[in-house]
Amino acid sequence: MAKTNISPGMQQYLDIKKNYPDAFLLFRMGDFYELFYEDAVKAAQLLEIGLTSRNKNAENPIPMAGVPHHSAQQYIDVLIELGYKVAVAEQMEDPKQAVGVVKREVVQVITPGTVVDSAKPDSANNFLVAVDFDGCRYGLAYMDVSTGEFCVTDLADFTSVRSEIQNLKAKEVLLGFDLSEEEQTILVKQMNLLLSYEETVYEDKSLIDGQLTTVELTAAGKLLQYVHKTQMRELSHLQALVHYEIKDYLQMSYATKSSLDLVENARTNKKHGSLYWLLDETKTAMGMRLLRSWIDRPLVSKEAILERQEIIQVFLNAFIERTDLSNSLKGVYDIERLSSRVSFGKANPKDLLQLGHTLAQVPYIKAILESFDSPCVDKLVNDIDSLPELEYLIRTAIDPDAPATISEGSIIRNGFDERLDHYRKVMREGTGWIADIEAKERQESGINNLKIDYNKKDGYYFHVTNSNLSLVPEHFFRKATLKNSERYGTAELAKIEGQMLEAREESSSLEYDIFMCIRAQVETYINRLQKLAKTLATVDVLQSLAVVAETNHYIRPQFNDNHVITIQEGRHAVVEKVMGVQEYIPNSISFDQQTSIQLITGPNMSGKSTYMRQLALTVIMAQMGSFVAADHVDLPLFDAIFTRIGAADDLISGQSTFMVEMMEANQAIKRASDNSLILFDELGRGTATYDGMALAQAIIEYIHDRVGAKTIFATHYHELTDLSTKLTSLVNVHVATLEKDGDVTFLHKIAEGPADKSYGIHVAKIAGLPKSLLKRADEVLTRLETQSRSTEIMSVPPQVESSSAVRQGQLSLFGDDEKAHEIRQALEAIDVMNMTPFQAMTTLYELKKLL
């Protein structure tokens, strides 16, 4: 960056820029925001705007690019979406009155995690996450600056931190400690996050809570410090810090949520085809956000679940009232976002009108809720604050046709302020007064073509042609002489003109001041508005779930304390919605008190994965308080769901399908309890047949003997069905098929017992493979099955506790010699779960050299 012969204005730019080296600096110059030097070059490319230069004839011209101030937000949005920060430097004084260089200051730093304004607003949350580490546990705080939501928790390990960040769909993570290189790679390269750093803790006594740990306080404090530092103002809309525990909700990793298509379809990354899409009959942006939160965090408290169920049942029983409620909610705007705009000093007249319109709807919503005449609904009614005084203020103060910008005028209603009304009367009637003066002077002077004109230089004046100069009255005074005419004024005309100019200037200034005063008054109601927003959002989600339940004929699930799963004629709610009720084939699912594992076999495409997902979605819907897709459901309360459904290599981190499978299996068996649900689909596919089968059997046995979680394990290893003879809590089920005249029909119904065939060649036939290829595959299969029966090479008997090896004690794999001890130490030092395939190969090579 060349800095020779820098002008005072450019020196000001450089002085400001050095404080924001990691951000694009938008430097306000008149009607444009300008960028210079490297910022200009990079922005021109990213924003597809013209790149020019300042002082083009200089030896080192300065690269320059700019965007109009009135459309700057759309360009800021692009930079933020690409993961950059933007610092906005405004002119702090009127350039016309400035002495020397116009004073400029950065008024806001916009980052991916602190977006409030956007040219394309999104109803979804935008969370900024802060993480701190005390050497033992992690503190994680998050905030949506646009709504004021502010929460904190503590977590045991980095895996939990990563999962929570993914669940929050954060775009920016604020760190108060140094990450390891591997952790940084995960966050930046795999999760595509912007990492920011903050060392200072915001000093705020209101943050101190005896229930918070030190690491939670520092995470929350650094988050607050960063937000105040970037937003550069007091944020009155920030809500009280809420402490939460992961264990208070049904725990699911991001991978689990993704495989179950909870908030978006994993194949399309769109909302359509997800559980969120199915359940969303909300009418407000606040309700949409809350519904997503409920899906993300189902409850584990039976009391809280039943409370939601009860309200949904009340709504279901009153169609007319519920319809009125839904229609009334359509008139509710995003109170949370409107409150934040007020807090940021960015709320315009349209924003206040939306807020006023919302408040006008609240009494109707409250009356409808009261009409349900239900104690559980009355709790919601009692939480609704109508704020009639604020609604009255907005209704009487803001003109219903007010523009979106403050500078255009016509904001304040007539009758709200006497002075403003007077000025408007002067402006409105002034033209009539001038017309009266013109008519009077024309008649008295005898100048038939006498008229009053106006221009910026001379103001209002009488236009008199040269032929009529002899008729000019004595009280006229000359203002200007032209070639064929002269311009005159009078004391009376000057007085009227002065009144009109004063009225125009004072009206504009007064109207602005009145609006600022009203906005300041609205800000004092923010806490009450946020409480109202939460209640209306809850009402919206509950009516949405009632509408979905009625439309799709869902039933109210029951809960038990004896670890029994009973689902009669259950359906995969999303698949049913996509396919249609007539096409979908329901399935019952049953786990008695004794059964902990269902081993499911059957061909591909027969419905095994759908059966597993059906159970998971039923549990999630039930524990979020929703009704479910079945004829009858009775469930235990689960504390976590672990899944491995579907295969996809993690190419970015260099992890294969098999490695990802093993990592997810490890997380499940380490974290699951006997109150958890485990769903494993075809575990062990990514390695050799015997290796995969051995691992699958060992995992099943481990879950059976040590974990005790309710588990569905889908497999193509038919040999594993023999485990039912040894494992007392395992039962076999299979997907039924119908064979007739060489054709196979998949019935998509689950039946007891193991499958007798896998029908893989039939699936290949459906896929359209050549007949000659299928014939050859059938020949090979026949030969392999014959060999298997004769040599029993495929037989992998389950572990038998009474075997001689167990009775005699397991022999040591390593022995007692020094070389074996060295190999053992090397193996124990390996962090298998965090190795890439390349690292694993390298380590194996090094171990081989020790032999």
Swiss-Prot record:
One of its GO terms (biological process) is mismatch repair. GO terms for cellular component: cytosol. Pfam families: MutS_I (PF01624), MutS_II (PF05188), MutS_III (PF05192), MutS_IV (PF05190), MutS_V (PF00488). InterPro entries: DNA_mismatch_repair_MutS, DNA_mismatch_repair_MutS-lik_N, DNA_mismatch_repair_MutS/MSH, DNA_mismatch_repair_MutS_C, DNA_mismatch_repair_MutS_clamp, DNA_mismatch_repair_MutS_core, DNA_mismatch_repair_MutS_N, DNA_mismatch_repair_MutS_sf. Belongs to the DNA mismatch repair MutS family. NCBIfam families: mutS1 (TIGR01070), PRK05399.1 (NF003810). This is DNA mismatch repair protein MutS. It comes from Streptococcus pyogenes serotype M2 (strain MGAS10270). The gene is mutS.
